[in-house]
From Swiss-Prot:
Keywords: Amino-acid biosynthesis, Branched-chain amino acid biosynthesis, Cytoplasm, Leucine biosynthesis, Magnesium, Manganese, Metal-binding, NAD, Oxidoreductase. Belongs to the isocitrate and isopropylmalate dehydrogenases family. LeuB type 2 subfamily. This is 3-isopropylmalate dehydrogenase. Disulfide bonds: none annotated. It holds the Pfam family Iso_dh. One of its GO terms (cellular component) is cytoplasm. Its cofactor is Mg(2+); Mn(2+). The record marks 135, 186 as: Important for catalysis. It comes from Streptomyces coelicolor (strain ATCC BAA-471 / A3(2) / M145). Its EC number is 1.1.1.85. Substrate binds at residues 94, 104, 128, 219. GO terms for biological process: L-leucine biosynthetic process. The lineage of its organism: Bacteria, Bacillati, Actinomycetota, Actinomycetes, Kitasatosporales. Mg(2+) binds at residues 219, 243, 247. NAD(+) binds at residues 279-291.
Length: 347
């Protein structure tokens, strides 16, 4: 019996167009013959904003909702005021589709340089809460523009929101060989939110006796990410701290050029979205210089989320092999890297 994979594709801005094309190339090559790939491209980002003033409408959300998953290239352009696309598209989509798990694997792959001394063992996953914290837009200003201006940005943390992301993190830790989960917060200063996170973490931990747990203040976690990244297996943290430490994690494991991410709706009520961590890089857009590796690894995350474990592993193996050989190869274009990876996964 044939199957189908119905994918919404959002190339977005800058190099997003180029890297998404290579991600789709690899996806088409790796899928079993009985799986029909159906894609629909959506024009979101700076071009549409300038043409229509729109970022993401309710009709757009309805159209996206019909798909199994979403593949995003990059959103952002210097011609658009800061915050317009970030809040009007990225955050709006995240909240509308309840992407409350932001998944960021960090693994130092063969042939990839790290700024850390030696070649440390780096293989961990950050599970970042995606729909609460200070990103909810709960805040404001008074006396704006005066020397007495006051600005607030409220961090919203609910027991429901915290528990569901903590449970997701425990399940992921349980499925990994090391079975270790670290909670990162700042509960000695942010006592209200911090204690909510800590209490729920400890409550859920009792249901996972095989998972080793520990706690780190976020400032201590940043130190250990640099001095001893091997101590981490799975990290769970809130939206703001997760936003910060995931980029540090990417930096120590080779940079954002190889960093993939998933914005996950674990229940499957809405399609999850997968994207490279890097930005739109308008300075090199259209020149064939962008490395599509992070997008290809995001495709692997997408496939694993949808249950295509073998295909995801083949992509990851192909990327590892390709990265390990790059030192002996001349520079390649975006499409040449995609061609190589597609050929590897096709066998």
């Amino acid at each position: 019996m044939s199957r189908s994979l119905n994918l919404a594709v959002i190339p977005g801005d800058g190099i997003g167009q180029e890297v998404v094309a290579e991600g789709l190339k690899v996806l088409s090559a790796v899928l079993p013959q009985d799986v029909k790939l159906e894609t629909k491209e959506f024009d979101f980002g700076a071009r549409r904003y300038h043409a229509t003033g729109e970022t993401l409408t309710d009709a757009d959300l309805d159209a996206l909702k019909a798909h199994d998953a979403i593949l995003l290239g990059a959103i952002g352009d210097p011609s658009v005021p800061s915050g317009v696309l970030e809040r009007g598209f990225l955050l709006k989509l995240r909240f509308a589709f309840d992407h409350h798990v932001n998944l960021r694997p960090s693994k130092l792959l063969p042939g990839v340089a790290t700024p850390l001394a030696g070649q440390p063992e780096i293989d961990f996953v950050v599970v970042r809460e995606g729909t609460e914290g200070p990103y909810t837009g709960n805040g404001g200003t008074i006396r704006k523009g005066t020397e007495h201006e006051v600005a607030t940005e409220v961090s919203v943390n609910t027991a429901y929101g915290v528990e569901r992301v903590v449970r997701d993190a425990f399940a992921r830790a349980q499925a990994r060989p090391r079975k270790k989960l670290t909670l990162v917060h700042k509960n000695n200063v942010l006592t209200f939110a911090g204690h909510l996170w800590t209490n729920i973490f400890n409550k859920v931990a009792a249901e996972y006796p095989e998972v080793t747990t520990d706690y780190l203040h976020v400032d201590a976690a940043t130190i250990f990410l640099v001095t001893d990244p091997a101590r981490f297996d799975v990290i769970v943290t809130d939206n703001l701290f997760g936003d910060i430490i995931t980029d540090l994690a990417a930096a120590v494991s080779g940079g954002i050029g190889v960093a993939a991410s998933g914005n996950i709706n674990p229940s499957g009520d809405f399609p999850s979205m997968f994207e490279p961590v890097h930005g739109s890089a308008p300075d090199i857009a259209g020149q064939g210089k962008a490395d599509p590796t992070a997008t290809v690894l995001s495709v692997a995350l997408l496939l694993r989320h949808l249950g295509y474990e073998d295909e995801a592993a083949r992509i990851e193996d192909a990327v590892s092999a390709d990265l390990g050989e790059r030192g002996d190869l001349p520079a390649r274009s975006t499409s040449e890297i995609g061609d190589t990876l597609a050929a590897r996964v096709a066998g």
